[in-house]
């Protein structure tokens, strides 16, 4: 697969999964716009030659549109979007706060919608949008209500947008990872079997495929990527 001449925007690009996706796309020859709420990545060298766009609040539709307009102008267009930006919260309903539900919606659903709307102003027919849902949203566990509900929203959004864009040949799909092997997750679950978790590079490989021409017949799919969890 080659992405020479194609520009792909990746949100949440400064985190563990985002960095893996940026690296995989650069290896395939893509021009990558790495977008994040953080002003700068902790490890800029890990993002290679990606064009860094820090300090972008993707929950702010106007700021998001402005960022994507700049990206498209700088690179002569946009061919794909990978929505990784998001967050997690563990909180039981009875003792929790409704503010957590609002925060999860803002971080997981609103960011994906705002970025997709902004990208669609520039995506050509045949473009690609990839979202990140969650296998834990298929059946939520205790303490997962707000997070799972927000990721379910991402999944329903994926299906709806895929239907809306079929006529343009723009595919919209989502991956449903289980636990991703990141430093933060290892710190939160130090006694877990890390070898069973999904590696960021494995998710990146699936994303690269869904962005490619070989995946042109796949749209509206919710793809489990669960490792051995």
Predicted regions and their residues:
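Conserved glycine-rich cofactor-binding loop
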Residues: 14
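Conserved NAD(P)H cofactor-binding loop of Rossmann-fold oxidoreductase domains
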Residues: 84-90
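Substrate-binding pocket helix/loop in short-chain dehydrogenase/reductase
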Residues: 92-93, 97-102
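Active-site helix of classical SDR
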Residues: 116, 150
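Alpha-helical segment proximal to the catalytic Tyr-Lys
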Residues: 121, 163-167
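Residue(s) in the substrate-gating loop at a strand-loop-helix junction
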Residues: 134
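C-terminal helical subdomain
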Residues: 167, 174, 182, 192-229
């Amino acid at each position: 697969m080659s992405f020479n001449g194609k520009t792909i925007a990746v949100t949440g690009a400064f985190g563990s999964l985002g960095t893996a996706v940026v690296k995989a796309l650069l290896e395939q020859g893509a021009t990558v716009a790495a977008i994040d709420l953080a002003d700068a990545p902790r490890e800029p060298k890990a993002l290679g030659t990606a064009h860094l766009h820090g300090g972008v609040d993707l929950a702010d539709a106007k700021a998001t549109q402005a960022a994507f307009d700049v990206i498209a102008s700088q690179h002569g267009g946009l061919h794909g979007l990978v929505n990784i930006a998001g967050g997690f919260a563990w909180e039981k309903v009875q003792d929790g706060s409704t503010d957590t539900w609002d925060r999860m919606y803002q971080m997981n659903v609103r960011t994906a919608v705002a970025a997709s709307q902004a990208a669609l102003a520039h995506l050509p027919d045949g473009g690609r949008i990839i979202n990140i849902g969650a296998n834990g949203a298929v059946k939520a566990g205790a303490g997962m209500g707000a997070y799972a509900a927000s990721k379910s929203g991402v999944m329903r959004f994926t299906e709806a947008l895929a239907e809306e864009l079929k006529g343009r040949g723009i595919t919209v799909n989502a991956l449903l990872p289980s636990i991703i092997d990141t430093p933060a997750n290892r710190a939160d679950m130090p006694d877990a079997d890390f070898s069973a978790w999904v590696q960021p590079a494995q998710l990146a490989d699936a994303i690269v495929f869904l962005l490619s021409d070989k995946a042109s017949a796949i749209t509206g799919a919710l793809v489990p990527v669960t490792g051995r969890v």
